[in-house]
Amino acid sequence: MVHSISILGSTGSIGRQTVAVADHLGLNVRALTTNRNIQLAEEQARRLHPAFVAVTDEASAKALRIALADTDIAVGGGENALCEAAVISDTDAVVTAVSGAVGLRPTLAAIEKGRRIALANKETLVCAGDIVMRRAREYGAEIVPVDSEHSAIFQCLTGRTGELHKILLTGSGGPFRGWTREATRDVTPEMAVSHPNWSMGAKISVDSATMMNKGLEFIEAMHLFGVTPDDIQVLIHPESVVHSMVELLDGTVIAQLGVPDMGLPIQYALTYPERKPSRSDRLDLTAYPNGLHFYAPDLEALPCLALAMRCARTGGTAPTVMNAANEIAVGLFLGHKIGYHSIYESVAAAVEAIAPVAAPDLDVIRAADQEARAFVRSYFRF
């Protein structure tokens, strides 16, 4: 297991849970980062005593620097400070818990230092999976997934390289499972962020409601495990007990089960290949007397999932465009500026309008990302 970590996005949902896991395991936290939640960042810094705190919002960084003036903790501002946090010395692993494509640069920076990446930022692989995985091989950096589904697949495949036939990627179906497309027209942000099983941040909660999150995970799985879209089957699993499964060449299916608690995959990413006692509840299968259920997703009712699967097949910059457009659209929805159905409509329009580029380098990926963001803002005249 690792002994010292940096937490990128420590004030978000996954970041806060990572702090709790680090406390439980007795890990040394070398760096923290936040966007602008400096009140929580200050509390974390005073408790964990990191060497460095990065704040991407420059004005907030100045305020935190003043607040921590009585300590020896350095405070950096701007996106470059994220990379500083990712490469700070004496760090065994970097937990990438920031939300969105902003996680790409610091992840690559940490990879180039040979650090273990506890990957909770799926957008990094969605946007630049080929590049990230190639760099990880080049620099000998381990990538251990934190997403519960990918952690499950990772655990099921340990020691079984070359034996995989199919990945069975599960998802709860979100708060609107079973609803028709028309029935979701008047969904509000407050409704969308209320997930039945998981405690998550606002953006990923909306993505879970639209099932875009499962689409992003579909693409992430392709890169993490070196498979094609035909090798992945999405299953709706309302109970969120089976976190994913793998079917092996001989027809055997291996599943990873557990309570829906992100503390478990976070801890495993930091203790791998060891296992340590956790603070999570134990799974009691007798609590499910009606059984565990699995069924195919209704892609007509879940167009974001269908769109993501199409972009996965297209490849190139198509997933980058989709992801960037979705980030802007979800932000507008959470701000009560657009309707729920407008998320899909604007993202699909961006994917249709912006031609994909095959085998892009990082400059092309960044350009596609920016073009997609500008497209959605223009689409809604913002």
Label each residue range with its predicted role.
Residues M1-F382:
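Catalytic, metal-anchored helix/loop core of enzyme active sites in primary metabolism
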